[in-house]
Amino acid sequence: MLEGAKLIGAGAATIALAGAAVGIGNVFSSLIHSVARNPSLAKQLFGYAILGFALTEAIALFALMMAFLILFVF
Amino acid sequence: MLEGAKLIGAGAAVRTMTEGSSNTSNANGVPIPIPGSTGIYEDHPGLHPAVDERVVEYQAGIREQMSELMRMDGEHPEVVAAAERVHGESDNIAFLQGLLEDLRAHGRESEAFKYGVPNDAPLPGGGNPAGSSGGVDLANGNEAGSSAGVDLANVDDAAAAESPLDQFGIHPILDLNIGEYYVSFTNLSLFMLLTLGLVLLLVFVVTKKGGGKLVPNAFQSLVELIYDFVLNLVNEQIGGLSGNVKHKFFPCILVTFTFLLFCNLQGMIPFSFTVTSHFLITLALSFSIFIGITIVGFQRHGLHFFSFLLPAGVPLPLAPFLVLLELISYCFRALSLGIRLFANMMAGHSLVKILSGFAWTMLFLNNIFYFLGDLGPLFIVLALTGLELGVAILQAYVFTILICIYLNDAINLH
């Protein structure tokens, strides 16, 4: 009973990935838009984009952490 | 053994009794078909919606009770083995209910517990401990339990060796206890010392005999690269200060970046240990840095630092909520800083481990198509390793740049 509930909970925790996917897509689409408008800033913008990507990805990893907590801690 | 036989006898008696009289309903009020009827539940007892679920529930209850009595974790193989001995995988509700009530009422003195955890089982570490007849002694009960479930524990260890999280295990190399504190030298400490040694060796080699050659060799280039990189970061991110004051923070930030970079990269060496995949380490780092930054803020602004919590130009009625929100988000910075690094490292390493385990298994399936098809997973593992190398560098960078941003916030009060 509890085992099954744990698995369901861990699976449900991965729904959060949808948000992270949208976020990462948004970061890079904005990068392409910006570089298309002003190619001379490409290098600087890429740095910002990578930072934004890392921050967004970290949110997805919080979801992963929740899944691990549900599976192994309780 | 005698008790066990008695117990089984009692269970059998209960079973026959309930089967004989179960023509009305069981304890749950669910009607059970009369013997002799051609109900579908009688022909296929597994189909009964209530019985199956309740059997599992009772068996779990027995395991829980056993784990409480044995003072061990419910997932512990010995507990599982003992619980299985007690209920014997029976699907008879009344029998299971009786066992559970016996366990609840009599605890360690109950027939069921004594059957599940035999006192006369041979102990691995020598003879029977004194006072085993009582069966109430804590240490004794634990020892008896451990010897009883020893076979299953071995089996479980072999299976557990495949878990992708095993690589993060901390094992003591030198056991040390000072007073009540456990201060063993573990593989974690070993790899942290290795990282430190590596960084110090690199810096030592470069600065030997005054260092700073006009034409740098490879090592000097590397150190200069890192130094320049962090110096640029500090100069760009922290504003509103003269160069001298700004550079008081520079050594701390440089050391943090170098330490994290080398920890992360060292973890990418196969069969090594990733220090930053433990939030023991990352949270200790992020919390101490967070406290340091807060102290810097109070030093520079005194009590005026609290204005940090209230953005300028906010209407007064909104202020209490905003202060609360800002306070929470400020405190959460410390947590998110550490967890981001930890989660990235742990997730990446587990992923590589899972996929490489998959490729490894596929290689030995004795089938030429699988053998050739294994190139696919292999390349995915290779690509992921490349990605992880990037993430290792990127996360050190992100950690450092966030420290700079937070420091800038504390100094300039947005």
UniProtKB/Swiss-Prot annotation, chain A:
Keyword flag Nucleus: no
Any GO molecular function: lipid binding
Alphabetic keyword roster: ATP-binding, CF(0), Hydrogen ion transport, Ion transport, Lipid-binding, Membrane, Mitochondrion, Nucleotide-binding, Transmembrane, Transmembrane helix, Transport
A Gene Ontology biological process term: proton motive force-driven ATP synthesis
InterPro entries in the record: ATP_synth_F0_csu, ATP_synth_F0_csu_DDCD_BS, ATP_synth_F0_csu_sf, ATPase_proteolipid_c-like_dom, F/V-ATP_Csub_sf
Principal location class: mitochondrion
CDD domains: ATP-synt_Fo_c_ATP5G3
Transmembrane portions of the chain: 8-28, 53-73
A matching Pfam family: ATP-synt_C
Localization per Swiss-Prot or TrEMBL: Mitochondrion membrane
General function of this protein: This protein is one of the chains of the nonenzymatic membrane component (F0) of mitochondrial ATPase.
Matching PANTHER family: ATP SYNTHASE LIPID-BINDING PROTEIN, MITOCHONDRIAL, ATPASE PROTEIN 9
Family: Belongs to the ATPase C chain family.
Protein name in the entry: ATP synthase subunit 9, mitochondrial
Source species of the chain: Oryza sativa subsp. indica (Rice)
